[in-house]
Structure formats: C-alpha cells, structure tokens
Amino acid sequence: MPVFKGSCVAIVTPFTENGVNFDKLGELIEWHIKEGTDAILICGTTGEASTMTDEEQKEAIKFTVEKVAKRIPVIAGTGSNNTAHAIELSEYAQSVGADALLVITPYYNKTTQKGLVAHFTEIARHVDIPIIIYNVPSRTSLNMLPETYLEVKKKAENVVGVKEASGDISQIAEIARIMGKSFEIYSGNDDQVIPIMSLGGLGVISVTANIIPAKIHEMTTAYLNGDIEKARDMQLELNPLNKALFIETNPIPVKTAMNLMGFGVGPLRLPLVEMSEKNLEYLKSVLRQYGLLKEEN
C-alpha cells in the first residue's frame, strides 16, 4: 500500500511571538480532515522547519500524530544536511507514531550521487517506516538523478518514493521508467500535479492545499478515478493561484494568504519577512478572483 494517494497538505506551522501555536495547528488539522485532505506533512519547507528548534519540531510531530489519531497518514519532515541529525529526528518521528518520513536531499554541503546513496541508506537502516525522498534542486543546489534512486532502493527497501520538485518532467518520466510502478512518485510542484500523475504519480504534497484543500483533493481524486478531463481542467483553472503562491519564497505568500483569509496563522520567522507591497497587492487580487478574499480586504 502506498503512503497515500491524492492530496497531502504541506501544512504551515502557526506561530505566536513565543513559539508554536498548537491550538491553531489543531484547528487546521481538523479542518483539513473535514475538507478531505488525504495526508498531512508536518515540519516541511512550508512548515518553516528550518527555523524551528529540534524541540519544536519534535513537539509538532508528536502533537500532529496524536491529533490526527490515525484518521489519515501523518508524514514527518525529518531531513537534514547532517545525516546523524536526520537519523535522530527520524527515529523520534517513528517512536511517536508517524506513518512515514519525508527526507530532503542534503543541502549546502553538496554531496555526490554516491553520497546521496550513503545518506539515505544510513537513515533507512535506523527506521522501519516508509521514507519518501524530497528532491528540490532549487533549494538544495543538488539534483538526485534517476539512477541514484535505483541504487538507494537496492540497499533500502523502506525508501518507497519521491516528492519530485525539480520541475523537470523528462527526469520524472525517467524515474518512473527506471523504478517501475511500485515506486511512489508525488508532485512537489502544485502547477505540475496532473502532468506528473499522467506519468504514474500518485498525487501531490501541496502548498496550495493550505488554502483550498477540498479543491486539491477533488482534482487528484478525479484523476485517480479516471476523470482525466476534469482533473486537467482543474489543474489549468488553479494554475494562476499556484503561481501567485510562489511569487515570493514559499511559505511567505501562502502564510500571508492564510492570514488575509482569517486563519490567523501568525508571523513568519526570520530570515523570512513580509511580502513587498506590490506582490501583496497582486496576491490579494488573485485571491479575490478565486473568491477566497472579500472585496474589502
């Protein structure tokens, strides 16, 4: 069985000035389950994991697992450019009941493809739950090549798939060809969900689902149920919104949008800062077009 099919929200982390707002996080989790979200990723890029302490990350993972209470899968972001640190977070996530892990390729230290094999194999050796690799070269300055997944899989059976955010459809097609249907491919880009699903992808780990979870669930479910035309039409309809949510570095626009829409998810953490006035006005105009923001806002 795959970790999930359909829409997994890369959920934002609500903050107060003093820490994680667990009351608000709990509200968001309940809302996502009600809206049909198929899985929740906690402590991903969109959740600002890079500016959370280890203690905050662990508390957020534990809280999410307990709040969800097995109603849908919980995927914990446990990646690091320090293999030992990734192992520590991964072991913790498994110990509190996470269903799977999302582990980003190492960033900044720019290892080789051989190093990627060693990194993921070593993490996988310390846990039993499924691991989804996260390939996002625009953030890491490192691209995991299709043949490297095969080398990892030979040594680590619990590496089950990839969140592919390279934007390179040819590369994703090659991963699908080399790895076969048992290897789970998830879109890491909201504007490429249906193209990737057409190559055998099972869904998306989504930023946009933070504000329209029911729509992203509906789109992916349509494709999975064979209604290709509906899924395609929804992808095209939503792409201007997807674009607006990446007009500045993620998660600046999506968190701003959520606050504009009344979700009250609190501030960004430095070094992320508020949007420029020009981009803010553009975001507002797009949200209004989709009926997500009242005209007076």
Curated annotation (Swiss-Prot):
Its EC number is 4.3.3.7. Pathway: Amino-acid biosynthesis; L-lysine biosynthesis via DAP pathway; (S)-tetrahydrodipicolinate from L-aspartate: step 3/4. SMART domains: DHDPS. Its main location: cytoplasm. GO terms for biological process: diaminopimelate biosynthetic process; lysine biosynthetic process via diaminopimelate. Belongs to the DapA family. PANTHER family: 4-HYDROXY-2-OXOGLUTARATE ALDOLASE, MITOCHONDRIAL, DIHYDRODIPICOLINATE SYNTHASE. This is 4-hydroxy-tetrahydrodipicolinate synthase. It comes from Caldanaerobacter subterraneus subsp. tengcongensis (strain DSM 15242 / JCM 11007 / NBRC 100824 / MB4) (Thermoanaerobacter tengcongensis). The gene is dapA.
